[in-house]
């Protein structure tokens, strides 16, 4: 199979939405019957985002094979059917690490290691490897043209453009075309300068996607085409929209997919965007709304919970309701108690690390349990629910996780020291292990207990979800917690680890050790999120009734 490559760069400012644009183009090409994948090349020195602060970088998206990756890979999976893996995201740090490891082994036979050719060759190998087996590979370059950090990546894709030729490569550049209120017009000069910067390093863009708060007039498109040496039909206007799922249709309406397929000489069917039209219709026509309180510690940056936010919206589509998310700092819950939890239709406690605010999360679980308020716990959200139940129902005073209190009298949650991976291999970690890359990561099979809400949600006796954690339920307390009324509704493939818990006599008190948000899409939803939002809508009706 001959893979074609589309390289996506950004200029003028950061946060233009390269990832959304790349994913939207991929969605159209997939709708034309093509096998598409997307890669993200990140210019930072970290090996991966695994140990980066969520308030700086946003969430860490976990792939099926256990890679800790950039949140843009979540966008990719929500827009196309192709599942991402560790080949779809790599950083400057990872490239340098691998090159230096080869140098230590003597693979370069004593050569002087340089950015060109050794680093650029390593980048090219990663890109070609990631695209193998697909009709089209879209490669997003992180950062902004002009940043010193991005230069090795830009040089690498420049070389690939020469080596693979125009028949197999296309360069798409996102720029900002701002509207100046005082002048009453859009300004194209930033775009011209951005393209000039890109051309100065040897890359001539084939397509310009011009971002702005409004559509770009035809005369301004012609001006951009003239001064940037790009065909006028290849100047695409991408205005701000109220839903990212409208973007595939916007790009298709301007013929971007047709331009790409003709450039590559690919004969394929017309794009059928019916599924996306259905998503947009459901989003625009809810029959009601619910308010979900998300109790977390990284709420100052909503992108820290990006996949959770999107999964709640997807669940709203399947329940025909609009989901309003109220972000609640768990430390505020510690200070003010139930005052900040009143008026909610459901409480969700997402994953997280560290002791700060954990008692607020435990209080939120207690409030939901005692007030029959739908509760959904994810990862740490499951652990705090179990701790709360142990303390206040099972009579285990002082129960806690050893992550937060080493000398707790009842360590109901403890460090996992050994577990089976999906391939059957044993993974191990200890108290002194590195933080990075030492968690239970990736897709794991979960056995669901018959007659539970979990099994009813999935309509199956097993599920496969993705994990990212170091701590688990202490099996020494299972019998006592079960006798107190807690149901262990999901167990690991070897039935040694607790994956899900729930309360049987509660409208919806369900929690999982895994991260179901990573598998939610607008077209398919995710069973637990759909069930949780349905319970929240039912709770609201009971209150109104």
From Swiss-Prot:
Name a single GO biological process: pyrimidine nucleobase biosynthetic process
Q: What's its top-level EC category?
A: ligase
Q: Which residues bind UTP?
A: 14, 187-192, 223
The reaction(s) catalysed by this protein are: UTP + L-glutamine + ATP + H2O = CTP + L-glutamate + ADP + phosphate + 2 H(+); L-glutamine + H2O = L-glutamate + NH4(+); UTP + NH4(+) + ATP = CTP + ADP + phosphate + 2 H(+)
Q: Which GO terms describe its cellular component?
A: cytosol
Annotated InterPro entries: Class_I_gatase-like, CTP_synthase, CTP_synthase_N, GATASE, GATase1_CTP_Synthase, P-loop_NTPase
| The organism's place on the tree of life at top rank | Bacteria
Q: Which residues bind CTP?
A: 14, 147-149, 187-192, 223
EC assignment: the record states: 6.3.4.2
Annotated spans, Amidoligase domain: 1-266
Residue ranges constituting the Glutamine amidotransferase type-1 domain according to the UniProt record: 291-542
Which purpose does this protein serve, as stated in its record?
A: Catalyzes the ATP-dependent amination of UTP to CTP with either L-glutamine or ammonia as the source of nitrogen. Regulates intracellular CTP levels through interactions with the four ribonucleotide triphosphates.
User: What's the name of the protein?
Assistant: CTP synthase
